[in-house]
A protein has these predicted regions:
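Extracellular/periplasmic helix-exit of transmembrane alpha-helices
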Residues: 2-9, 14, 123-139, 182-184, ...
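Transmembrane helix-loop junctions in multi-pass membrane proteins
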Residues: 49-61, 69-72, 92-104, 124-136, ...
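Juxtamembrane helix-boundary/capping and inter-helix hinge elements in multi-pass membrane proteins
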Residues: 9-19, 28-31, 67-68, 172, ...
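A generic transmembrane alpha-helix motif of multi-pass inner-membrane proteins
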Residues: 128, 291-353, 362-392
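Helix-loop-helix module between adjacent transmembrane segments
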Residues: 2-15, 21-22, 26-56, 62-95, ...
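Flexible loop linkers connecting adjacent transmembrane helices
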Residues: 1-30, 224-249, 282-288, 350-360
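Membrane-embedded translocation segments of transport machinery
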Residues: 98-182, 200, 243, 250
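Membrane-interface loop-to-helix entry segments
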Residues: 39, 43, 56-62, 79-128, ...
Length: 392
């Protein structure tokens, strides 16, 4: 639904589209500019404050990759970590300052490959332990319907963790992925709704399920068969996952698989970081399209918040409180976005009815009783097929 609204109310900026939750929020709430500026500002703050946590994830993954490859543990004050910081800041600056088209040019090449590699590696590990699959289902179903899980604190803890990690994984209903939906060049708004729905399915039911299989099969996430150490597992997510991979993999393959899994994890975090800053830039266009203002957002993300995240790692600081802030900000974005979805639902249903009646044919916003800047006869042209643009 939110992706369809993002498509409906997107706007054209030279050779690219901009849009998302602040844009459709402004239109749905009376087209008041102050509403759009407020929503855009809220998202920019949200996105930029998520950057340090992703920076931390990148360091964690690359540090583990290097430790596994060399067989030696590297401290945060080592030359390795300073090298990671230098490469990370430089690559982010080059990509972000080059504009959204440059970011999408590279992420479109990284994301499919890393997703396919991660799924393939996960399936390989599961197949290597296929004899333990019945134990997996017995543990999951037995734990879910045990009296202490149903009526005790375990259910509440599991539910809270599930909601937080679910939002973190697919962002459904949160409004924070709508900027990506808006920039897509579609023939009908509902097309992007179907694409984003598949994204939620893939993130949650494929990626998360494969990860869960490995963690539960290894059974390293519990102190005992009946007592889950949630706090410890939450504080060391990648450590627990990598240890699970090692426990389930033959000794001849464990180092190779850990290196590959760590690489996938680092790429996931890196592309998420790029996405957050790019989405902040898209939202900033609603406040001002001044080239200086947009450049300022790019600089703030790539040369302030990314280095800040790197410095927190090099200083040896733990980001437990930052994760708590991230979880809170995710919930706040849901509370902002859900009322907007309720307001926009009639338009989405009308657009879907048109999509079915016209079999995905030409769409004009006037057919569902709303005027937009893009879905009019004079704007029905596709974007030029260019992959990179210089900073504007």
């Amino acid at each position: 639904m939110e992706s369809v609204l993002a498509q409906l109310f997107k706007e054209r900026k030279q050779d690219e589209f901009v849009g998302g939750m602040p844009y459709y929020g402004q239109r749905l709430l009376g087209n008041r500019r102050w509403v759009g500026v407020t929503l855009a500002s809220a998202f920019i703050v949200y996105a930029l404050f998520n950057v340090p946590s992703q920076t931390f994830n990148i360091f964690t993954a690359l540090g583990m990759l290097a430790d596994t490859a060399t067989g030696q543990a590297s401290g945060r004050q080592s030359a390795l970590y300073y090298g990671i910081a230098l490469v990370l800041v430089s690559s982010c600056a080059w990509l972000i300052l080059g504009g959204i088209r440059r970011v999408t040019h590279w992420t479109n090449r990284l994301v499919p490959g890393m997703a396919a590699a991660f799924c393939g590696l996960s399936l390989l590990i599961i197949l290597l332990n296929i004899a333990a699959i019945p134990d997996f289902f017995a543990l999951v179903l037995g734990g879910a319907f045990a009296p202490d899980a149903l009526f005790g604190g375990s259910m509440g803890i599991a539910l809270a963790e599930g909601v937080r990690r679910g939002l973190m994984s697919n962002e459904a209903g949160q409004g924070t992925i709508t900027m990506a939906a808006a920039v897509a060049d579609n023939d009908h708004p509902c097309e992007q709704g179907f694409v984003q729905a598949m994204g939620v399915f893939f993130d949650t039911l494929v990626i998360c399920t494969l990860t869960g299989f490995i963690v539960v099969l290894a059974h390293l996430w519990t102190g005992s068969a009946s007592s889950a150490e949630w706090a410890a597992a939450s504080a060391a997510r990648l450590d627990v996952y990598v240890a699970s991979v090692q426990a389930l993999t033959p000794a001849a393959l464990d180092r190779t698989l850990v290196i590959l899994v760590s690489t996938c994890y680092a790429l996931f975090a890196f592309t998420t970081l790029l996405g957050m800053i790019s989405f902040a830039e898209i939202s900033a266009n609603l406040i001002s399209r001044s080239p200086r203002f947009i450049l300022g957002i790019r600089v703030l993300g790539s040369l302030v918040f990314v280095p800040f995240g790197a410095l927190t790692v090099l200083a040896g600081l733990e980001l437990g409180n930052l994760w708590a802030i991230t979880d809170l900000s995710n919930i706040l974005m849901v509370y902002i976005n859900i009322p907007l979805l309720l307001l926009g639902a009639p338009l989405v249903y009308r657009a879907l009815a048109h999509y079915r009646a016209a079999d995905g044919g030409r769409f004009l916003s006037a057919t569902i009783g709303v005027q937009t800047t893009h879905w009019v006869a004079s704007e029905q042209t596709h974007l030029p097929d260019t992959e990179e643009t210089s900073p504007r």
